[in-house]
Amino acid sequence: PNMYNINSAMEGRQYIYGLMGFDMHGKTAGIIGTGKIAKILIHILKGFGMNVLAYDLYPDYNFARQEQIVYTSLDELYHNSDIISLHCPLTEETKYLINDYSISKMKDGVMIINTGRGQLIHTNALIEGLKNKKIGSAGLDVYEEESEYFYEDQSDKIIDDDTLARLLSFNNVIVTSHQAFFTREALANIASTTLQNIKDFMNHKPLENEVKA
């Protein structure tokens, strides 16, 4: 379903054209990166009756046994997944992980979700995949050049980024402004973790969330 049709339904125009979806039950989700957020997502997807394939450089096999998921290669994940969701960090190895070549290995009509980092996806390759129907739909909470457009009201401005404008023109693409984290609970957790990190640093304790360069 696209946002135009959803808005039309809310305004009382109750037609079903363009609202055809698919059952998640029995479908296969491919999860790339299995950190904390991905593990919560996997638990939810299993509740919908989905099969889950996962890829991570450091597989958590105890978690895999608990949730009855399978760690596999990227090629196998691309080939067998109906939905692919990205949760890996952005590194030199993962930059443009989703590109023309990897998309060519995917199922026809695959759904791609990115709530990680914009540069995990080569945007022009994504657009080509959408144009030729290889990609059936996409949900993007991040975009390569998001700092120019996200977090501010752009409704009265002309988007001069032709790539973003093209993405927004597809009725099977939803772009949100890097707000997947934006809940009361998440903000409280961020504040609590930040304060604890400061406290640990001041008391010369090990820093649980330290990122080393």
Give the ranges of each region predicted by the language model.
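NAD(P)-binding Rossmann-fold cofactor-contacting core
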Residues: G47-R65, Y143-E145
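Rossmann-fold NAD(P) dinucleotide-binding segment
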Residues: E93-I112
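Short glycine-/small-residue-rich Rossmann-like dinucleotide-binding loops
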Residues: D82, C88-L90, G116-R117, Y143-E144
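Glycine-rich Rossmann-fold phosphate-binding loop(s) that bind the pyrophosphate
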Residues: T34-G35
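Phosphate-binding beta-alpha-beta segment of Rossmann-like dinucleotide-binding domains, i.e.
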Residues: P1-T28, I40-H43
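Rossmann-like dinucleotide-binding domain for NAD(H)/NADP(H)
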Residues: G109, G118-A213
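Short acidic low-complexity segments
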Residues: R65-S81
